[in-house]
Amino acid sequence: MQPCPIKPTDHLLPHSGRMVLLDEVLSYDDTSLHAVCTVRPDCILLPPDSPDALPGWQGMEIMAQGVGAWAGVQALDAGRPVQLGFLLGTRKLEFGVPAIPVGTVMDVKAVLSWLDNANNMGVFDCTLAVRTPPAGREAELPAGTLLLSGALNVFSPPNREALDAILGR
């Protein structure tokens, strides 16, 4: 097992630079992961016309990175390289807020619900909740406030050839 906390998280995800959104992994096991993400003023997902808050639906990418980090630590623990993964869709998506203000520190939790190793597909029940509210918003967004939850359907191609076939290359 990787010692926790794991910080930075870029080696767990097939992302780089500002696209890596998770600050650290606090804990993980065979079926779950708990990470932290801060909505920073330079967050790549912030819309130019509303730079003070992340649209709630963008939280799906943060939850997907929680799933990706889980897959990353599982791969590293097994001596395998980190693989590319895809968010296929969501179910039971529930928004606690329409937007997540800059400065919000969030708990990101992903719990494995179903895994098909033969086809490299899985379902994870995920949540984003306020860990630390942004300054001045403590009454509006107290710690523990559920921001977003849902079941994420994911797929990871087993190899480069399979990915090329999917992409029609």
Language-model-derived ranges and their functions:
Residues 51-69, 84-85:
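Compact, glycine-rich, soluble single-domain proteins
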Residues 23-26, 96, 111-113, 153:
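Conserved positions in beta-strands of structured domains
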Residues 3, 69-109:
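Hydrophobic beta-strand-centered segment that forms part of the acyl-chain substrate-binding groove
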Residues 20-23, 88, 108-110, 150:
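Small-residue-enriched segments and motifs
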